[in-house]
Amino acid sequence: MLNWDDEPKTESKAATQNGPAPVNVDDKRVINGETDINQLAPFKYPWAWEYFMNANKNHWTPLDVNMAQDVHDYHHRLNPAEKHVYENVLAYLTTSDILAMRNIGLAVMEKMSAPELQIYQARQVYEESMHTWAYQHCIETLNLDQSEIYNRYRVVPEIHGKIRMANRRLDAAMRPDMNLRNPDDLQEFVMSYLFFAAVFEGAWFYNGFSPIFALQRRGLMRGTGEQLQYILRDEAMHFSFGLKVVNQILEEENITLDPKAVREMWDESEAAETAYANYILRDPILGYSAEYHSEQFRFVANRRARTVGLEEPFPGAKNVSPWLDEQATLRKEKNFFETRVIEYQTGAQLEW
């Protein structure tokens, strides 16, 4: 029987003394680190652990939201232009969140060399799958043609254009032969991650829910709007974390991004977003138009650029949707008899 008072065997002592050296926190790095990826602490990046802890305060599921009124609104209150907006926003989002899930899980997470970063990213992968469930739940609840909605990204050029651009830029980080000690590969990876954090999640997602929020603000599709509010809160943490990681990599690896490549990223993403806005809002809805959507994208892009120390790509862009930030920070009080009470916290206040 094991006696805890017994001294360890001599060979065990020797094995311990001759084993790997303890992890020195100063040796940890975001990428290209050589410390033990299986040892969580000591933390080099305590902020990453805070993101993980805060994310776990934000738990929700699509089944927490009452969608009964949405069924009535969609079939009896929305006009054709509003249905066009609603369906195509969902068509874009259904594919995008799966793309986001795969990018984090297959391309980014495995390149991190500090476990506190990976642990939050594992939570992020879970949240992206939850978001995909939310879109599917909306589609099922309204009895929409799933095959038709899901295939729109293949047949609608304006939706396909955004997905194609995202695939091209994100696939670069999934190359099996990528060597982050090679300056060219490192630049390519950081540009891919910058696109993901600043554009894909930080601008396209962040701004992309706005057309449905515009319906929600008029008392339409409030259940869907509430689902998207919860998703937006998750996404706000995602892109905030991603931009923080990008900043950390730039500092640790002492690299400067290619200004031409950065400019091309902004211009290409704006062109894709403008084409998308012109399609989904070809007929403006009350209180929201394609011009409104595109201008807000430019304003949001400026904010993301400033976060990583880049010049504003679209100087003078106006904040035409000041209510958008409120959607990511609003605490919701629910009537117990209408839906399950959800105290959706953000934990600590984060700066976007």
Identify the role of each PLM range.
Residues 69-352:
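Non-heme di-metal
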Residues 2, 15, 71:
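Catalytic cores of phosphodiester-bond-cleaving enzymes
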Residues 1-11, 351-352:
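Extended acidic low-complexity intrinsically disordered regions
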Residues 15-68:
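Amphipathic alpha-helical packing elements
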Residues 13-15, 114-115:
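A short alpha-helix capping/helix-coil boundary motif
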Residues 5, 48-50, 61, 205, ...:
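Short linear interaction motif-like sites in intrinsically disordered regions of transcription factors
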